[in-house]
Amino acid sequence: MSDYKSTLNLPETEFPMRGNLANREPEMLKSWTENGLYQQIRESRKDAKPFILHDGPPYANGDIHIGHSVNKILKDIIIKSKTMSGFDAPYIPGWDCHGLPIELKVEQKVGKPGHKVTAAEFRQKCREYAAKQVDGQRDDFIRLGVFADWQNPYLTMDYSTEANIVRSLSKVIDNGHLHKGVKPVHWCTDCGSALAEAEVEYEDKMSPAIDVAFTVVDKPALLAKFGVNEYPHNISMVIWTTTPWTLPANRALAVGANVEYTLVEMVKEGQAQALVLATDLYESCVERFGAESHTVLGTVAGSDLELLRFNHPFYDFDVPVILGDHVTVDSGTGVVHTAPGHGQDDFVVGQKYGLEVANPVGDNGVYKPDTEIFAGLHVFKANKNVVELLEEKGALLNHVQIKHSYPHCWRHKTPIIFRATPQWFISMDQKGLRQQALGEIEQTQWIPDWGQSRIEKMVENRPDWCISRQRTWGVPITLFVHRETEELHPDSVSLMERVAARIEQEGIQAWWDLDASELLGDEADQYRKVTDTLDVWYDSGSTFSSVVAARPEFNGHPIDLYLEGSDQHRGWFMSSLMISTAMNGKAPYKQVLTHGFTVDGQGRKMSKSVGNVIAPQHVTNKLGADILRLWVAATDYSGEMTVSDQILNRSADAYRRIRNTARFLLANINGFNPETDMVAVEDMVALDRWVVRRAAALQQELLEAYDQYNFHLVTQKLMQFCSVELGSFYLDIIKDRQYTAKEDSNARRSCQSALYLISEAMVRWIAPILSFTADEIWKLLPGERGEYVFTETWYQGLQSVALESDLSDEYWDQLLAVRAEVNKVIENARREKQVGGSLEAEVTLYADEALQAVLENLGDELRFVLLTSKTEVVALAQAPSDAIETELASLKLSLKKSEAEKCERCWHHREDVGAVAEHPTLCTRCVTNIEGEGETRQFA
């Protein structure tokens, strides 16, 4: 017989080397959808223990970006791994559909509500626009291989959800957490209405910049703080502002608790006075004030000045010093004029100190009739009058005109103001919500754990939550308020349920169409309907109740996990916590996981202007979704997540390693029937038993990593296994046995059994991450199986068996190390053309006593482990002087090219080639494998 190729067991598989994912994945998606895969998974987990991950709804506007992809893929990996762990883990995706960005898009097309279109028509247009955006985003999410009930998502604009949001608010009200107050908002005096952040543009504007002195009320108390016994002249604290018109509303002076302040005497035109200024700024200040000389009298920390009082510069009252985190020493005086009715920072810090939110300005930007001195003046015209009055009172230390960036109305292009307007709030303290929420944070697991202190600080310091907006497209605050007393209707809670029932049938328009008399009868004239809408953060923050508690898939089970970007401590995690605690006295979640933002290779934020945006659509079309999924899984999401074309190409390389491993496994179990060909683990060749043991140990590690959401560890350990234990060791060693042993021999079937077990386990390991590839592998695995890997659980067939006669795992670790050293020497010899390949080499190993015993254990099978034609083990003491040193102190090597004939079939160089006359080109091992019983292997 001259052609022995037909006697070899050569690998064969339909699993292609190239993934061609960009083209193949869409076909698989189509098949998954047509076969109702998501429903099959649900069916397979009927009555199983539930695991509920609640989807934080992305906003239904624009294309998805890479951050959306990270978020959805992380959720998908969790859902799939929990399903593999036997849980019933439904995934209902959601979208946030109300609010300003959608209004603005619709406004560009149809104009403002009440102009060319009615408010009702405008809402309908918003609804249609949001629905279209949802469709676009849904297609992009599906393309990522995310499994969800895509045909039945939740939308915050679903009639049922809108109704449940109203019901949620009624519970918050019933529990006593709502109150009415005022809050400063961006206000356009030309529009006569509030503006949202998105409607504000910043343009340069000339404004008066003034330094104003507030004289101290209790001079001895102030002097004592600075350690000064007495001072005969005036003492003042100085503020700097570019909005003189807000001074009538001043109610405090804010200093920084950790900022140092100096009491400095300034002499100007022969007159002395002492001023309190930030230490870092006093020199530039006194120079600006035109001082002829100055003397430092003392310094203190801002915290020491708290609650000292100073006289208002032109009204007959005094104001306190308060501490504010917003105070800086970048410019000005280091003291901030505080008017809670005219600034967000002022308002927040004012709430802490219970300051009056004075609002002397009407809708049209004119001071109200009861405003002392300035009644009837427009605020911007009043700047001049305020400056003149300050000069007259001797309180003006400096006045210049400056050019600076200032908020303008995007419609009128005119400067806007901050002014306090009546709003609805959820109170943090009137019913102990703050303390309750802090207690609930303690009961929640935060991943990473720094999330806990972050949200705790926010809850400790946050003001009451303003939940009202003056918008058209939003869930209405369905309240009736008494026209004279401004009190809520006493039956508000039951009235809200009746309104909710209508909204459930007709959507939010039902509220605006409702005539008060339909619900209030004769009382209708005494009450007015509230026209405000809810903050969209209330919409999304109440979905634990409006969606999860309402949908049958969740069966009333508590939510296990919220997972969003780290900005959501302030956003969705916070709003959900507040509403749930206000409604039910407990947090809505057991665990909260946050991931970092995506940045480019240089750590910069993604930005179209910088040109560093990586669009997920581009990645899936070019590389495939599995590459994007592998990048997400392999990246430690606890910090910023770096992505670039180069990084994605590295993910593609890692993917190829996994794919090549899978291909090798499939090609070598081709024709293997697990029913008839399986070798029991205890009957396997020792090396095969070892690799099954390694796979079993690895599975434990992977399952633990999945359970703890450490997906980067899953990919690291998997890559290590594919590259080191399998690629560089096991798969390399078994090729000879797999290809040359008798087809049905124990030597070969043992090896195939191990490969089969690893394949069954590995396809499940990768399924949550490389979903498309896992499905492809699953369909090519031998043996009876269900249609999809995704309905399976983790593989139970990996038995960690070690026989008494077995070589220990430490032993195999030593062999791995020895083989690595031998490989280096052979590679070197190949480079220097001493040998053509490892089978041309004959190697002598000089080992110390312990290692010698280990190596000699294997007998003649050591050569199969080292992939050489011949190996000899000799005592280290006998090593010649030219023996090659290795990184193992216990081992030296020598290598020579074999002079023996090469076997045509197995390519080993053996002395016995041609010993059997009928097969002159074969070694006796190959003859046994072709014609005899076949070789037996014990170790490798």
From Swiss-Prot:
ATP binds at K608. CDD domains: Anticodon_Ia_Ile_BEm (cd07960), IleRS_core (cd00818). It catalyses: tRNA(Ile) + L-isoleucine + ATP = L-isoleucyl-tRNA(Ile) + AMP + diphosphate. One of its GO terms (molecular function) is tRNA binding. It is found in: Cytoplasm. Its cofactor is Zn(2+). Catalyzes the attachment of isoleucine to tRNA(Ile). As IleRS can inadvertently accommodate and process structurally similar amino acids such as valine, to avoid such errors it has two additional distinct tRNA(Ile)-dependent editing activities. One activity is designated as 'pretransfer' editing and involves the hydrolysis of activated Val-AMP. The other activity is designated 'posttransfer' editing and involves deacylation of mischarged Val-tRNA(Ile). Monomer. This is Isoleucine--tRNA ligase. It comes from Shewanella pealeana (strain ATCC 700345 / ANG-SQ1).
